[in-house]
């Protein structure tokens, strides 16, 4: 049995998040179908994280166990040749069998983009949130600094009941502004349910 670690990128506009759901098209469903086709066996991919409807991913990791001997480069080419234009496999490598995309994950980074202008930018409609009123960058930065470090984040989750611990570490919470474009970057060792959204 081989274990493959795969990195991919996707534009989430047309999908109801990553995780497979009944009666809704998801990234996992599409990718599993194409990966199974290339490996010539029915497989389940293990994603590093759930993403919500419409969320995009730049570097998303998944792992898959397979009996196939396909070389990693052939895997990348084969799957990319079958995927729609809004999903792309970036790389593939063989890893130890105990590697799991979710449980072996050391950190996650989220990027939120805001188009801060009176007028919408039609080229950014599904890539950034349009906010008309002026933002106080300094106030946002001061608030963001409070989250950095190791804290109990239960108050910033909509459900803490099934977690062994609600302690998480935020490595950075940065605000970058360039003209009308505001980028919020948050990196942590993990996030509770809805934690990133509530923060």
Regions found by a protein language model. Give the residues of each.
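Structured-RNA-binding interfaces characteristic of tRNA pseudouridine synthases
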Residues: 1-199
């Amino acid at each position: 049995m081989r274990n493959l670690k795969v990195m991919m990128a996707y534009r989430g506009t047309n999908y109801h998040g990553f995780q497979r759901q009944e009666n809704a098209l998801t990234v996992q469903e599409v990718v599993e179908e194409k990966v199974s086709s290339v490996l010539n066996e029915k497989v389940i991919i293990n994603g590093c994280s759930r993403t919500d409807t419409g969320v995009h991913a730049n570097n998303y990791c998944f792992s898959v166990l397979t009996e196939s001997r396909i070389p990693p480069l052939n895997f990348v080419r084969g799957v990319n040749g079958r995927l729609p234009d809004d999903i792309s496999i970036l790389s593939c490598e063989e890893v130890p069998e105990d590697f799991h995309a979710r449980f072996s994950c050391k950190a996650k980074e989220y990027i939120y983009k805001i188009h801060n202008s009176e007028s919408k930018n039609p080229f950014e409609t599904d890539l950034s949130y349009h906010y008309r009123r002026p933002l106080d960058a300094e106030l946002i930065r001061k608030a963001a600094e409070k989250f950095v470090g190791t804290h109990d984040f239960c108050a910033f989750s909509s459900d803490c009941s099934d977690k062994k611990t609600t302690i998480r570490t935020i490595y950075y919470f940065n605000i970058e502004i360039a003209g009308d474009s505001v980028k919020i970057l948050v990196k942590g060792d993990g996030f509770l349910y809805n934690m990133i959204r509530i923060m």
